[in-house]
Design a protein with these regions (language model features):
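Amphipathic, charged alpha-helical segments and their helix-to-coil junctions
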Residues: 33, 44, 69-141, 145-149, ...
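Bacterial N-terminal signal peptides that target proteins for export
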Residues: 1-8
Length: 198
């Protein structure tokens, strides 16, 4: 009886050790880098100047030291490793087409609407009319077209990376990126709904 109990305990311990959970997490740093490249491509190629002092270097990583107990545990239980710096794919035929349409709009009338303060960026990665009366009638559809492309872009990036559930995080990352890359004088609406001038 004692041997059976000991055997069951040992088998349960081995079974518990064998249970490994691998978390698929949102790669924030890779998403920020990808968003910055996409946004830079749209704004820079359409003639929008980069903000002064806008150095977008990623913060340095802390040194990764291992505790001795972790090294011993790694000897006993093989570790499952995920990619150290996962990649976010933002290039696909769909996103390339969206990028070109966005560049054309920014190279055309949309930049003028931002410069005049008639429109601004929102906290959810879209464009909103700040002063609808300042938007000429023939340009009012630009905001709707831009937002349709932005919604499609965020969904396409999440889908291209095999994680549709990341769409909200991708949207937030891009929303922050649009505001950071915006030139001085452009408006943005923060999470509370208040308009602010950069």
């Amino acid at each position: 009886m004692r041997k059976l109990l000991t055997s069951l305990i040992v088998m349960a311990a081995i079974a518990l050790v064998g249970c490994v959970t691998i978390n698929v997490y949102f790669p924030e740093a890779a998403a920020q880098k990808a968003a910055d490249q996409f946004i830079g491509n749209v704004l820079d190629d359409s003639g929008v100047a980069r903000p002064a002092g806008g150095s977008s270097t990623a913060p340095a990583r802390p040194a990764s030291g291992k505790q001795p107990s972790a090294a011993v545990l790694d000897l006993l239980i093989p570790a499952a490793y995920a990619a150290e710096s996962p990649d976010i794919q933002v290039r696909s035929p769909e996103t390339d087409a969206i990028r070109e349409r966005m560049k054309n709009r920014f190279g055309g009338a949309l930049k003028g609407l931002f410069d005049s303060g008639a429109v601004g960026f929102t906290a959810d990665g879209l464009v909103a009319a700040r002063d609808p009366g300042a938007i000429p009638l023939d340009q009012r559809s630009l905001v709707d077209q831009e937002n349709a492309d932005r919604n499609a872009l965020y969904a396409a990036i999440a889908k291209a990376n095999g994680h549709p559930e990341w769409e909200g995080q991708i949207r937030k990352t891009f929303a922050d990126g649009w505001v950071q890359r915006a030139p001085s004088g452009w408006y943005y609406r923060d999470a509370s709904g208040a308009w602010k001038r950069k």
